[in-house]
Regions:
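Catalytic cores of DNA base-excision repair glycosylases
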Residues: 2, 22-194
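Extended, low-hydrophobicity segments enriched in charged/polar residues
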Residues: 5-9
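N-terminal, positively charged, Ser/Thr/Ala/Gly-biased leader segments
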Residues: 13-19
Length: 194
């Protein structure tokens, strides 16, 4: 029965951040195919990963568990291996690959976004990603952190649950999002955003 903490000072955040990274090294989801270099090699901090595979994975993981999304991602990448292939596909072909994954507007938005992205460099900012259909702050932050090693916080349901427990906060209501974003940012290790 601890008191909830409203603000995370640097002194309070550093040991929590370290503990989270230690936990991640032991129990985290390493080895996800979109977070590896070709050949299955983990990236060095200066390595850029393929933004396309990460983007597809992050959209599939919106409201969908990893165990469900992973086989869909593998099939998707076999059929649409590049943003150009996705943009050139018919919407019916895209929907067919998405069939069974649910939340079908995600497939339509991926297709729309692919058509906007073709011929342009990948976005390197939150604003650039969030300008695309179906991309919010958490998805944009996750893509930028994973693909480009940019230190940006995320705040999905899992992160909220962990933060609520760490900070002795009652079940997180939506109106506390600003507080939870501040905690997520305070706990982010700028040297290890992936």
């Amino acid at each position: 029965n601890r008191e909830p903490i409203d603000a995370l000072t640097e002194a309070k955040a550093a040991p929590l951040s370290t503990a989270l990274l230690v936990w991640w090294e032991r129990h985290g989801r390493g080895g996800l195919p979109w977070k590896l270099l070709s050949g299955g090699v983990p990236p060095a901090p200066d390595d850029q990963l393929d933004p396309y595979g990460i983007w597809i994975a992050e959209v599939m993981l919106q409201q969908t568990q990893l165990a469900v999304a992973l086989p869909y991602w593998r099939r998707w990448m076999a059929v649409f291996p590049t943003v150009e292939a996705l943009a050139a596909a018919s919407l019916d072909a895209v929907r067919l690959q998405w069939q069974g994954l649910g939340y079908y507007s995600r497939a339509r938005r991926l297709h729309e976004a692919a058509q906007l992205l073709v011929g342009h460099p990948w976005p390197h900012s939150l604003e650039g990603w969030m300008a695309l259909p179906g991309i919010g702050r958490t998805t944009a932050g996750s893509i930028l952190s994973s693909a480009f090693n940019v230190p940006l916080p995320i705040l999905d349901g899992n992160v909220k649950r962990v933060l609520a427990r760490l900070m002795a906060h009652p079940r997180p209501p939506a109106r506390d999002d600003a507080l939870f974003w501040s905690w997520s940012e305070a706990l982010l290790d700028p040297l290890r955003p992936r």
